[in-house]
Amino acid sequence: MAKAYDHLFKLLLIGDSGVGKTCLIIRFAEDNFNNTYISTIGIDFKIRTVEIEGKRIKLQVWDTAGQERFKTITTAYYRGAMGIILVYDITDEKSFENIQNWMKSIKENASAGVERLLLGNKCDMEAKRKVLKEQADKLAREHGIRFFETSAKSSMNVDEAFNSLARDILLKSGGRRSGNHSKPSSTDLKPSDKKNTNKCSLG
């Protein structure tokens, strides 16, 4: 029996508590949004399979499950990760400033050359914005990584961000190269048109 996928990529989301990591994972994996915050014990992950460059990619997306509050994210969490998404909240300047600390954590714990992506979440809360898009764009350029602003609430750019990272990993690992991979990947999965009224203030 043929495998249901061609590649398995382990992705991590890291960032300060409350920036919306869990909400982003649930939006990506289940196309759902819930503003009720339930802190999980230990490590949790969700799975979604996408098609990129004609390959079926199984994405195993890991959540820190609140560990960052206790500074207990260990090397074991980073082990085997092929891509890491650094998340901050555009309405929380401190969460953006701490991205540099998370970059340091990656350098100390993750495999050399792991693909990274910077993600500014809660862009549906423009009126409360504290971090300018230009600031994050500059930081991403300094580190040579991609940058997206997303909203787990509205689903804006969520698929695009995850698929872009998956495509970069695929190309790096010797997958089929497209004519232009500078754009975020397109997949067979369409963004949600659902409107939600809740805010993802935690996660």
Curated annotation (Swiss-Prot):
* UniProt xrefs under Gene3D superfamilies: P-loop containing nucleotide triphosphate hydrolases
Q: One Pfam annotation, family name? A: Ras
Can you list the GO cellular component terms from the UniProt entry?
bicellular tight junction; cytoplasmic vesicle; endocytic vesicle; insulin-responsive compartment; lamellipodium; lateral plasma membrane; neuron projection; plasma membrane
Domain comment, as recorded: Switch 1, switch 2 and the interswitch regions are characteristic of Rab GTPases and mediate the interactions with Rab downstream effectors. The switch regions undergo conformational changes upon nucleotide binding which drive interaction with specific sets of effector proteins, with most effectors only binding to GTP-bound Rab.
Motif Switch 2 extends across 63-80
Name the source's superkingdom.
Eukaryota
Q: Which residues carry this modification: Cysteine methyl ester?
A: C200
* Positions where lipid (S-geranylgeranyl cysteine) attaches: C200
Q: Which family does it belong to?
A: Belongs to the small GTPase superfamily. Rab family.
Family annotation (InterPro entries): P-loop_NTPase, Small_GTP-bd, Small_GTPase, Small_GTPase_Rab
Q: Which residues bind Mg(2+)?
A: T22, T40, D63
EC numbers listed for it are 3.6.5.2
Give the encoding gene's name.
RAB13
Please name the GO terms of the biological process aspect recorded for this protein, alphabetically: bicellular tight junction assembly; cellular response to insulin stimulus; cortical actin cytoskeleton organization; endocytic recycling; endosomal transport; endothelial cell chemotaxis; establishment of Sertoli cell barrier; neuron projection development
Name the segments for region: Disordered: 173-203
- What does UniProt list as this organism's lineage? Eukaryota, Metazoa, Chordata, Craniata, Vertebrata
Give the location in the cell. Answer: Cell membrane; Cytoplasmic vesicle membrane; Cell junction, Tight junction; Golgi apparatus, trans-Golgi network membrane
Q: What name does the UniProt record give this protein?
A: Ras-related protein Rab-13
A molecular function GO annotation: GTPase activity
